[in-house]
Design a protein with these regions (language model features):
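Flexible, glycine-rich loop/tail regions that form catalytic "lids" or insertion modules at the edges
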Residues: 138, 144-149, 153-337, 400, ...
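Short beta-strand/loop segments at the ligand-binding rim of alpha/beta enzyme cores
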Residues: 82-85, 351-354, 430-439
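Short N-terminal or domain-adjacent regulatory/targeting segments
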Residues: 17-25, 319-349
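Glycine-rich phosphate/diphosphate-binding loops that line cofactor/substrate pockets in enzymes
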Residues: 35-37, 284-288, 339-353, 397-403
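Short acidic/histidine-rich active-site segments
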Residues: 117-131, 157-163
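Helix-rich catalytic cores of soluble enzyme domains
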Residues: 1-112, 126-146
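Cofactor-cradling patches in redox/metallo enzymes
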Residues: 369-379, 383-475, 479
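Conserved, mostly hydrophobic/aromatic
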Residues: 65, 116, 147, 166, ...
């Protein structure tokens, strides 16, 4: 989230090269079959609102991948050198204010990856217009699918060759992007490759910094977002309904899933499952290819949890760098008054104000939590952020171990009520319910009120895009409490 076009291309290509270099080095694939492995590499990219830039981004990536396949990996078959990629149209740019405008944003972002035939996406994943409000209903999802079908079947888009070939503007922009990307690829290669650039947080730090710049540009008005920081006047939308405009997560869904799993486990052949898991464990222990053993596990009826638990025992659990270890301060985004207030409160407390940022549940969207972490650091707080997919127990245990002054939860999965209830319950059980708790996410107004009644100090949604104001809010809550 937040990657610039050159970062997206260079990080994706360097990662692909890392995979192919490793496959080549381990010798499991015969030399004559290696081009087939190259041909199976596929990418998943983002499509943003900058229409021309995004189209040129994919033409650049297509050209560079062809060069890499030809020169680096000696692939001759043109079919195996194609850039195979799917697209997630940019959910980051969807807005809660005037959400009907998101329909146009989604259309434009889709066009940027389908108009240029030579760099056309092979698969497209469109968000729904109301994803900044909550989880989309089947009707909302259908609306997005219909957009793809109209483009494919009603327009003449698929009837022509690439209409951008011969454009000097496009050619110059692509050449400029190529130079920037090649420079970045060289930096990563000198570092030791993509794995090294992940392990030393080089990639993540840059991504968080780019996202911080984007947030700052929106706050200052340098980047215009219609309905958010410009043209905010609006008539009431007939599409927006706080009570029925999106799916609500059933509070019993977890219990129902556990019940189904128990039924499944009781019906399957336990002996067959045990043998399949043992075979998986042996393959992983010997550092062999685990694919065949994993397929056998699936056929035997092994659950995803059992599969991952088996591998976790051998490999451990990987926690990716968060990218918030260092301040990514953007000077124009610096709120000196908040900084002074936090310093004053830290002096009163005889130690630095400490904030815990938590991502509970299966929600993997981390950019909001990262931006809050960075802004809180810049405001003078000590920040504890351990990444995504944490359990309520892990978050509360960290709050106790770190003696934090405030907890900020980021929940975009739609499970904000159940997860918040569980965390508040655990805080009370551990006698630390006096710690202020704030929650951010795609939270309907009706649920905001419920969460405040539960004891949440403040709820933030996409309409609260000004991080300086959020930090000022944090200072208010902390000063009032301590």
């Amino acid at each position: 989230m937040g990657a610039t076009p050159d970062q997206e291309i260079s990080y994706a290509l360097s990662n692909a090269c890392e995979v192919l270099n490793t496959v080549k080095k381990n010798g499991q694939v015969p030399k004559k079959d290696f081009p087939l492995v190259v041909g199976r590499i596929s990418f998943f990219v983002n499509a943003g609102i900058k229409f021309i830039t995004e189209m040129c981004k994919m033409r650049t990536m297509t050209s560079l991948w062809n060069d890499i396949c030809t020169k680096k990996y000696k692939v001759k078959d043109e079919k195996l050198k194609r850039l195979r990629y799917g697209v997630q149209v940019n959910s980051l740019g969807l807005t809660e204010p005037q959400p009907e405008n998101n329909v146009y944003r989604i259309l434009l972002e889709m066009l940027s990856v389908v108009l240029s035939k030579d760099a056309r996406a092979r698969a497209i994943q469109l968000p729904a217009w109301n994803e900044a409000l909550g989880l989309p209903r089947p009707w909302d999802q259908q609306w997005s699918i219909r957009l793809q079908q109209i483009i494919a079947y009603e327009t003449d888009l698929l009837e022509y060759q690439d209409i951008f070939n011969g454009s000097k503007v496009v050619k110059n922009k692509v050449e400029k992007l190529k130079r920037i990307v090649k420079k970045e690829l060289n930096i990563i290669e000198k570092m030791g490759g993509a794995v090294a650039a992940v392990e030393n947080s080089y990639m993540k730090n840059n991504l968080v910094k780019s996202m911080s710049q984007r947030v700052s540009d929106i706050e200052t008005g340098e980047q215009i977002v219609v309905g958010v920081n410009r043209f905010t006047e609006t008539a009431e939308s007939p599409l927006k309904n706080d009570k029925e405009g999106f799916i609500k997560v059933d509070s019993n869904s977890e219990k129902n899933q556990i019940r189904k799993l128990k039924i499944w486990k009781n019906k399957r052949n336990q002996s067959k499952c045990f043998k399949a898991l043992k075979k998986l464990e042996n393959a992983a222990t010997r550092n062999e290819n685990i694919m065949q053993a994993s397929i056998e596990c699936a056929h035997a009826g092994v659950t995803t949890g059992e599969w991952t638990d088996t591998l976790r025992k051998i490999y451990g659990e990987y926690r990716a760098p968060t990218g918030v270890g260092k301040s990514s301060k953007i000077e124009k985004n610096n709120n000196k008054k908040v900084n002074e207030r936090i310093n004053k409160l830290s002096s009163k407390l005889k130690r630095r104000v400490k904030l815990l940022v938590g991502k509970p549940g299966l929600d993997g969207h981390s950019s909001g939590a990262e931006q809050i972490s960075v802004a809180a650091k810049d405001a003078g707080m000590e920040v504890v952020y351990e990444g995504i997919r944490l359990t309520p127990e892990q978050i509360v245990n960290t709050a106790i171990e770190e003696s934090v002054h405030m907890i900020a939860l980021s929940i975009l999965s739609g499970s904000h009520l159940s997860l918040t209830k569980e965390i508040i319950k655990l805080l009370k059980k551990n006698k630390i319910s006096n710690i202020p708790l704030v929650v951010g996410g795609f939270i309907p107004e009706e649920d905001e009120k419920k969460m405040i009644r539960l004891g949440v100090s403040r709820v933030y949604t996409p309409k609260n895009y000004d991080i300086n104001l959020i930090m000022s809010d944090f200072a208010n809550i902390l000063e009032k409490h301590y």
